[in-house]
């Protein structure tokens, strides 16, 4: 038997994990084992909302060392994280300034300024990326305007996964799928757009040319002295999650469900027409030259904040209580930018209901019901938008990531969208990370080959739409006429 041992470092906005994958070549089986899981979150530092990258690096190294201590020979390592955020380095590789998080308010007003000065359509034609106020384009402008004293010291700007790869290997890389989330990569050249970079105030010398997934960045030397390849995987966590989505045919859509919900489809060509611009559709880079045509939805961030504020620890009990409540009594638009990072999420949700003359969700279960129903309805809106954009309906929706464990939300999604939902795999970002490593090690041919492995080894659950459900009736009778506000457009 031939085995490969690959390690995936998967960092999300609320948690991180170091996972060991064991691939058996002869039977094409893949098993995952969690080695180390740790918390991640936002911090306040010198007036900014930041990430504790030192703590994250320590947790990554701890997880890697645990694998080595077990005597396991690691064949490769890959790192994926969230998008848009970056770390600045000087000529000696030391950090400059703070690793500011995308939920910081420093970019307020800059997206509108860019649209006024450069033209909204021109920015979109160049980048193909949706307008979000925290895109790297606006973060860099905020940096150069508000902290000009840092500029002379900056030699390099590394996106989060590239920074952690650099810390392990000493080698710098700018991975393509994550680079596209910045709104700074030209969609035609796959290189940094000079006009957009110039507006941001950043120096092009801070960046190297983006590289597509599948190359070896460098090597991490483990405590035992072995040199282990660190692979540039599809380092944007959604790009990795899509790789592990067992999409079957052109009529399959995906929903990567976590802190954010990313709903979309794969395409060989981008969509940058006026319809796509009006819908704020993004064309993020994927593996093998594919595009992830998708839309950002605020996702389970709202629930995470409610759980935190109400100090709720038993999520299954909350979901059970939520399921017993009637549907669609409290409806908000999760994509309203008032929910990006409010001081108190519960109060913000209640205020949104009050302002629209609805009942006010008071209990924990009512707040959760409001979030789940509102998300499912927004999923239906976005799926319809995506189908109209490409001129063809979808036959199934694959929900992947941690959020796919929420069976109530899965069923609500199936009912609201009127589509068959296949939930799983849960650890989609980790699996997609592993998939690129296995391709780099010449164990698998391509993404479609890897998806066959996922289909046969992952635990998948199907949810059939119920046209007689409360939310299905709501969609048919009321929801189809409502107007929704674009997220940050």
Swiss-Prot record:
<feature type="binding site">
    <location>
        <position position="304"/>
    </location>
    <ligand>
        <name>ATP</name>
    </ligand>
</feature>
<keyword id="KW-0067">ATP-binding</keyword>
<keyword id="KW-0808">Transferase</keyword>
<dbReference type="GO" id="GO:0004370">
    <property type="term" value="F:glycerol kinase activity"/>
</dbReference>
<dbReference type="GO" id="GO:0008993">
    <property type="term" value="F:rhamnulokinase activity"/>
</dbReference>
<dbReference type="Pfam" id="PF00370">
    <property type="entry name" value="FGGY_N"/>
</dbReference>
<feature type="active site" description="Proton acceptor">
    <location>
        <position position="237"/>
    </location>
</feature>
<dbReference type="GO" id="GO:0019301">
    <property type="term" value="P:rhamnose catabolic process"/>
</dbReference>
<dbReference type="InterPro" id="IPR043129">
    <property type="entry name" value="ATPase_NBD"/>
</dbReference>
<feature type="binding site">
    <location>
        <begin position="13"/>
        <end position="17"/>
    </location>
    <ligand>
        <name>ATP</name>
    </ligand>
</feature>
<feature type="binding site">
    <location>
        <begin position="236"/>
        <end position="238"/>
    </location>
    <ligand>
        <name>substrate</name>
    </ligand>
</feature>
<feature type="binding site">
    <location>
        <position position="402"/>
    </location>
    <ligand>
        <name>ATP</name>
    </ligand>
</feature>
<keyword id="KW-0460">Magnesium</keyword>
<feature type="disulfide bond">
    <location>
        <begin position="353"/>
        <end position="370"/>
    </location>
</feature>
<comment type="pathway">
    <text>Carbohydrate degradation; L-rhamnose degradation; glycerone phosphate from L-rhamnose: step 2/3.</text>
</comment>
<dbReference type="Pfam" id="PF02782">
    <property type="entry name" value="FGGY_C"/>
</dbReference>
<dbReference type="InterPro" id="IPR018484">
    <property type="entry name" value="FGGY_N"/>
</dbReference>
<feature type="binding site">
    <location>
        <position position="296"/>
    </location>
    <ligand>
        <name>substrate</name>
    </ligand>
</feature>
<feature type="binding site">
    <location>
        <position position="259"/>
    </location>
    <ligand>
        <name>ATP</name>
    </ligand>
</feature>
<feature type="disulfide bond">
    <location>
        <begin position="413"/>
        <end position="417"/>
    </location>
</feature>
<dbReference type="GO" id="GO:0005524">
    <property type="term" value="F:ATP binding"/>
</dbReference>
<keyword id="KW-1015">Disulfide bond</keyword>
<comment type="function">
    <text>Involved in the catabolism of L-rhamnose (6-deoxy-L-mannose). Catalyzes the transfer of the gamma-phosphate group from ATP to the 1-hydroxyl group of L-rhamnulose to yield L-rhamnulose 1-phosphate.</text>
</comment>
<dbReference type="GO" id="GO:0005829">
    <property type="term" value="C:cytosol"/>
</dbReference>
<comment type="similarity">
    <text>Belongs to the rhamnulokinase family.</text>
</comment>
<dbReference type="InterPro" id="IPR013449">
    <property type="entry name" value="Rhamnulokinase"/>
</dbReference>
<dbReference type="GO" id="GO:0006071">
    <property type="term" value="P:glycerol metabolic process"/>
</dbReference>
<keyword id="KW-0547">Nucleotide-binding</keyword>
<feature type="disulfide bond">
    <location>
        <begin position="68"/>
        <end position="222"/>
    </location>
</feature>
<protein>
    <recommendedName>
        <fullName>Rhamnulokinase</fullName>
        <ecNumber>2.7.1.5</ecNumber>
    </recommendedName>
</protein>
<dbReference type="InterPro" id="IPR018485">
    <property type="entry name" value="FGGY_C"/>
</dbReference>
<comment type="subunit">
    <text>Monomer.</text>
</comment>
<keyword id="KW-0684">Rhamnose metabolism</keyword>
<keyword id="KW-0418">Kinase</keyword>
<feature type="binding site">
    <location>
        <position position="83"/>
    </location>
    <ligand>
        <name>substrate</name>
    </ligand>
</feature>
């Amino acid at each position: 038997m031939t085995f490969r041992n690959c390690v995936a470092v998967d960092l999300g906005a609320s948690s991180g994990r170091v996972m060991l994958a064991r691939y058996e070549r002869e039977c094409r089986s893949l098993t995952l084992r969690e080695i180390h899981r740790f918390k991640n979150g936002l911090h306040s530092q010198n007036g900014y909302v930041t990430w504790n990258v030192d703590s994250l690096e320590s947790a990554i190294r701890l997880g890697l060392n645990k694998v080595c201590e077990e005597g396991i020979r690691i064949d490769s390592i890959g790192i994926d994280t969230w998008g848009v955020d970056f770390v600045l380095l000087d000529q000696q590789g030391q950090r400059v300034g703070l690793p500011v998080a995308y939920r910081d308010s420093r970019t307020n007003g800059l997206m509108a300024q860019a649209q006024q000065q450069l033209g909204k359509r021109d920015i979109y034609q160049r980048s193909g990326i949706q307008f979000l106020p925290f895109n790297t384009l606006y973060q860099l402008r905020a940096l150069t305007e508000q902290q000009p004293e840092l500029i002379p010291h900056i030699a390099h700007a590394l996106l989060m996964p590239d920074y952690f790869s650099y810390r392990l290997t000493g080698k710098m890389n700018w991975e393509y799928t994550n680079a596209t989330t910045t709104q700074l990569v030209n969609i035609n050249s796959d290189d940094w757009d000079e006009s957009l970079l110039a507006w941001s105030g950043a120096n092009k010398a801070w960046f190297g040319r983006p590289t597509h997934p599948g190359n070896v960045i460098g090597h991490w030397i483990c405590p035992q002295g072995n040199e282990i390849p660190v692979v540039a995987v599809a380092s944007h966590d959604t790009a990795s999650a899509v790789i592990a989505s067992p999409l079957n045919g052109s009529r399959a859509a995906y929903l990567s469900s976590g802190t954010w919900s990313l709903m979309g489809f794969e395409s060989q060509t981008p969509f940058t027409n006026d319809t796509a611009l009006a819908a704020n559709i993004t064309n993020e880079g994927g593996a093998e030259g594919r595009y992830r045509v998708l839309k950002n939805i605020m996702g389970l961030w709202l629930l995470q904040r409610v759980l935190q504020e109400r100090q709720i620890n038993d999520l299954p009990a909350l979901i059970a209580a939520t399921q017993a409540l009637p549907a669609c009594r409290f409806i908000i638009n999760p994509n309203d930018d008032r929910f990006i990072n409010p001081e108190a999420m519960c109060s913000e949700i209640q205020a949104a209901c009050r302002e629209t003359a609805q009942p006010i969700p008071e209990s924990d279960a009512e707040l959760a019901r409001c979030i789940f129903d509102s998300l499912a309805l927004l999923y239906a809106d976005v799926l319809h938008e995506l189908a109209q954009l490409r001129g063809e309906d979808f036959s199934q929706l694959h929900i992947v990531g941690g959020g796919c464990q929420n069976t109530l939300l899965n069923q609500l999604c199936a009912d609201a969208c009127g589509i068959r939902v296949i939930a799983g795999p849960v650890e989609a970002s980790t699996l997609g990370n592993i998939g690129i490593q296995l391709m780099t090690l010449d164990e698998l041919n391509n993404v479609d080959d890897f998806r066959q492995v996922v289909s046969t080894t992952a635990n998948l659950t199907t949810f059939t739409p119920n046209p007689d459900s409360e939310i299905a009736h709501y969609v048919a009778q009321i929801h189809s006429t409502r107007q929704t506000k674009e997220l940050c457009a």
